[in-house]
Amino acid sequence: MMEVPREIIEKLEIFQKLVKKWNKSINLVSDNTIHNFWQRHILDSLQLIQYIDNKEIHLVDIGSGAGLPGIVLSIAGVAQVSLIEADLRKCIFLEKASKISNNNVQIINQRIEKVEIDCSILTCRAFSNLNTIFNCIKNISVREKFLLLKGKNYLTEIVEAKERWLFGYLIHQSITCEEGKILEVSNLTKMI
């Protein structure tokens, strides 16, 4: 299990309360997962921190929605986080949630395809399949790697993406779900 400092746990608990409050009006997470929020959402997001060697980086989280994993990783110490979310209501929530973190959090209310930005690491959770993700981020420069939280169809997604893209990848087991995987993708290039 992960060792998490008390100060971070306290901030994550505040974040959890905020998500639950806002979820009643803008559906940030599935109602079926609210009862198990800490395991299903907080730990699922927080586990990515073990694959981030240097926290003094710029991380971009696409399709941020409820701030998972972006806000959680910012609270856990990632120095600069940009959250890209097209839904204005969710951006208003993200603005409130970003105040919980001591680090630099930028909210970008645009479609991912329109955003031009450079980062060290790109994350997303419950967003889309690999092909769609890779197509959406054509204007985002990812210097180091992608950390993508995936479910049971991860192998199919890899096979399908390999038909259009060249990339290296590692598969890590999720600590929160047997079917869950973390895809660590690097050196992404579109085939000609």
UniProtKB/Swiss-Prot annotation:
Record-level GO cellular component terms: cytosol
A GO term, aspect molecular function: rRNA (guanine-N7-)-methyltransferase activity
Free-text function comment from the UniProt entry: Specifically methylates the N7 position of guanine in position 527 of 16S rRNA.
Protein name, entry field: Ribosomal RNA small subunit methyltransferase G
Keyword Membrane found: no
UniProtKB keywords: Cytoplasm, Methyltransferase, rRNA processing, S-adenosyl-L-methionine, Transferase
Protein localization: Cytoplasm
E.C. number(s) listed in UniProt: 2.1.1.170
Protein source organism: Rickettsia rickettsii (strain Iowa)
SUPFAM superfamilies: S-adenosyl-L-methionine-dependent methyltransferases (SSF53335)
Lineage of source species: Bacteria, Pseudomonadati, Pseudomonadota, Alphaproteobacteria, Rickettsiales
Amino-acid positions noted as binding S-adenosyl-L-methionine in the UniProt annotation, renumbered to this chain: 63, 68, 112-113, 125
Gene name of this polypeptide: rsmG
Disulphide bridges: none
Family, similarity comment: Belongs to the methyltransferase superfamily. RNA methyltransferase RsmG family.
InterPro entries: rRNA_ssu_MeTfrase_G, SAM-dependent_MTases_sf
Reaction catalysis annotation: guanosine(527) in 16S rRNA + S-adenosyl-L-methionine = N(7)-methylguanosine(527) in 16S rRNA + S-adenosyl-L-homocysteine
